[in-house]
Structure formats: structure tokens, C-alpha cells
Amino acid sequence: MAKKIIGFIKLQIPAGKANPSPPVGPALGQRGLNIMEFCKAFNAQTQGMEPGLPVPVVITAFADKSFTFVMKSPPATVLIKKAAGVTKGSPKPHTDKVGKITRAQAEEIAKAKNADLTAADLDAAVRTIAGSARSMGITVEGL
């Protein structure tokens, strides 16, 4: 018989930097889960990633105080800012442009995000990434 699920916890944690302090500790502690066990497992799985890159994670908590977690790809906005070489988007995205990325960079981001996007094909995924970039004040060359 399957374990009884008592809840899901959604967090964004920097790769390789999970520790018992907020937001991880309180979120897991409320469900009675072993915080250090999660931190060690998460840090081990994010070892190959760029340190500090925010990674969305969905933790499934079970009634017997065990858990499983699924990591998603980093947010598109973080990848776009990294590709454009900017620290933050434009406060007026439709008038003030803060950077630019090429279509090739947008394709690379779309491939990295492909599992989490609902796009039918790569071209649709690239257009989704381009739309996110435009809403941040970053132009996409070649589209």
C-alpha cells in the first residue's frame, strides 16, 4: 500500500546551500521532517550545479515522517539575467532596455527549461523565453 501524503512543500533554495535556517528549517519542521537529512540529500544532488543558483524543489511529506523531493530547473528569469550579464531587470521594461541576448542563448535556456515548460516544441519554448526576457527589459536578437 502507498504511503499517506500529508502535504507538499515548495521552496526555492540556492544550489548546494541548503541549511536548517529559514526558509528550509521552519517549512520542514512544521511537518515533523528530518531537516538535516533533507539538507544533506539536497546539497548532494545539487553538487554539480553552479553554487548559489536558485533551484525550485517540491518536497512530498508522508505521514510516517519520511519525504521525497523533486528538483525543477532554475527559474527562467535567473538564466536570462545570467545570459544577458545583468543583475536585475528594467523597472520600465517596454521603454528602458537593460541588456540583450541572442536567439542562440534563448534556445540554450529553452533547452535547459524544456522539462518544466508546457511548450509543444523548441521554437514555442524559445518564444516563451523571449517573452519573459522582453518583460524584463531585455531584447532578444534574431526573433
Swiss-Prot record:
One of its GO terms (cellular component) is cytosolic large ribosomal subunit. This is Large ribosomal subunit protein uL11. Belongs to the universal ribosomal protein uL11 family. One of its GO terms (biological process) is translation. InterPro entries: Ribosomal_uL11, Ribosomal_uL11_bac-typ, Ribosomal_uL11_C, Ribosomal_uL11_C_sf, Ribosomal_uL11_CS, Ribosomal_uL11_N, Ribosomal_uL11_N_sf. GO terms for molecular function: large ribosomal subunit rRNA binding; structural constituent of ribosome. The keyword Cell wall biogenesis/degradation does not apply. Keywords: Methylation, Ribonucleoprotein, Ribosomal protein, RNA-binding, rRNA-binding. It holds the Pfam family Ribosomal_L11_N. Forms part of the ribosomal stalk which helps the ribosome interact with GTP-bound translation factors. It comes from Cupriavidus pinatubonensis (strain JMP 134 / LMG 1197). One or more lysine residues are methylated. Part of the ribosomal stalk of the 50S ribosomal subunit. Interacts with L10 and the large rRNA to form the base of the stalk. L10 forms an elongated spine to which L12 dimers bind in a sequential fashion forming a multimeric L10(L12)X complex.
